[in-house]
């Protein structure tokens, strides 16, 4: 969508990607990335031309939710939206955006919970007791481990996190990738 690779363009691409997931309007996008309404509309149109499946997903999700009053994440967990058919445009619009977003955010949260459970079990066995899971921030997990064990523990973390959705109940055609950084403290990891 945006040809060059400057930091400003990276920010714009991220704003468009996340904005669409959250149901951003052309006016909201224009304000966020500091372009005209017309340019924002062109970005959104180009995005949906390049990724028509996303628009299909959004429309299908809203249609399903209007009929059923709920949506499911990839694990089947339901989120209810009782006001999705409200006569008030603002209420209805908010519910539509939330219904589109709930399966995405809910699925991501569930994947993280499953990864944390698996890692907690794996790291609590006798030979991994020196490693502690300290913190979760969105889609990141922070661990503390002795330097001499970092390589071995890194492999365990990558293996467990990337395979969290490979089971009898859940199998996805798109692999989960895991980026892992090591450092002396949290500030050096980014």
Per-region residue spans from a language model:
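Hydrophobic, well-ordered secondary-structure elements that form the walls
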Residues: 29, 112, 119, 139-141, ...
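Conserved phosphate/anionic-ligand binding catalytic regions in large, soluble enzymes, centered on
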Residues: 16-29, 102-105
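C-terminal polymerase-core module
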Residues: 49-101, 144, 148-190
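Single conserved hydrophobic/aromatic residue that forms the stacking wall/gate
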Residues: 1-11
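Catalytic palm subdomain of template-directed nucleic-acid polymerases
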Residues: 25-38, 141-158
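Short acidic (Asp/Glu) and glycine-rich catalytic loops that position anionic groups and cofactors
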Residues: 21-27, 37-41, 90-98, 134-138
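Extended, well-ordered alpha-helical scaffold/bundle regions in very large, multi-domain proteins
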Residues: 22-60
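Active-site palm subdomain of RNA-directed nucleic acid polymerases
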Residues: 111-137
């Amino acid at each position: 969508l945006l040809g060059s690779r400057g930091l400003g363009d990276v920010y714009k691409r991220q704003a468009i990607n996340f904005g669409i997931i959250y149901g951003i309007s052309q006016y909201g996008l224009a304000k966020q990335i500091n372009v005209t309404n017309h340019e924002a509309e062109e970005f959104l149109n180009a995005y949906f031309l390049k990724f028509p499946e996303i628009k299909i997903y959004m429309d299908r999700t809203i249609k399903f939710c209007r009929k059923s009053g709920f949506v499911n994440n990839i694990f089947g967990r339901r989120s209810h939206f009782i006001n999705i058919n409200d006569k008030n445009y603002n209420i209805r619009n908010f519910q539509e955006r939330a219904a589109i977003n709930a399966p995405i955010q809910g699925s991501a949260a569930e994947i993280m919970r499953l990864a944390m459970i698996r890692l907690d079990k794996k790291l609590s066995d006798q030979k991994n007791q020196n490693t502690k899971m300290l913190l979760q921030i969105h889609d990141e997990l922070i661990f503390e481990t002795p330097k001499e064990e970092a390589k071995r523990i890194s492999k365990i973390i990558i293996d467990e996190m990337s395979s969290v959705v490979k089971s009898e109940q859940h199998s996805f055609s798109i692999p989960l990738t895991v980026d892992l950084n090591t450092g002396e403290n949290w500030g050096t990891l980014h």
